[in-house]
């Protein structure tokens, strides 16, 4: 298998239940094309359903006991505090480390957790890059370690989108009856602005790099669907008992709008990389979207995970993948192994995932190594 470029795209919480409805309605044409000409399937998640742990398992092909990322926070024993999880706590090499070691150029955008950005042969923009820490775009700083290499920091800083920069034109596609919103200080409107600006910022950075840097693999992570679902899924049709009429009238289409926006970003990305690039689109888990939607959540830090479904998505599209097929029995551990296989590299025998042989157009030669 001749190595071709690869794009890996993560949509946190994306779910076929919603996607298939939108494809049928003609609202996600790019993903519809990928499904028609590629391979689709479910990805089983892991327990507990905590995104930093899950995306690290995706990036390493290993369970948390091997890679060391167990949740959103970790103890700092010397300082006697609990701190946000960081990339320095990962105990196993991720695919970007392996590919760099093997002479491949890799770009990684917003992977969770990837702060501080790691030195790789390419560009890494950490998961803190898009977060607006202060009101006002002019006062928006950027912490050291957000971008590697450091000399690109000012460039990437300049192409971010702050929530306060969004206009009615940007927000109206996500709203019904927007005239009923009483104030710009509406908390749900502010939440939507932040989620949308975050996604647009990651897209801005990744498309700049696709166009202006040399790369063999580009990995792009978006958490906007997950955040939109946590904020607005209860307001999606069909209307749940107890949902206020005024909120339903305004925000019932917000989740679907966020999916449509992701399809637009996907279309732009695929047009930039061309038909000879292998593309893998995944999510770490799904999200309850029907009568199973909980109206209340456990009062604990990980309580929102109760809204998740156990299966995420996978769609593989490109010259090395089958066409119009459905694959079965895959999990989020089964992403790094096929990435390595696409580049003709061996899979670590200490990896817990498999190389997704059923997804390939031609059965690849799978090599192994004791560990990376």
Q: Each PLM stretch: what is its role?
A:
Residues 19-62, 105-107:
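Short, structured active-site-proximal loop/turn typified by the sulfatase FGly-forming signature C/S-X-P-X-R
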Residues 41-44, 66, 108, 279-280, ...:
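Acidic/polar loop patches that form or flank catalytic/metal-binding clefts of enzymes
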Residues 62-246, 349:
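His/Asp/Glu-rich, glycine-adjacent segments
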Residues 81-86, 193, 252-256, 320-329:
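Active-site rim elements
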Residues 278-318:
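Histidine-centered active-site microenvironments of extracellular/periplasmic hydrolases
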Residues 359-372:
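Long, internal low-complexity/basic segments
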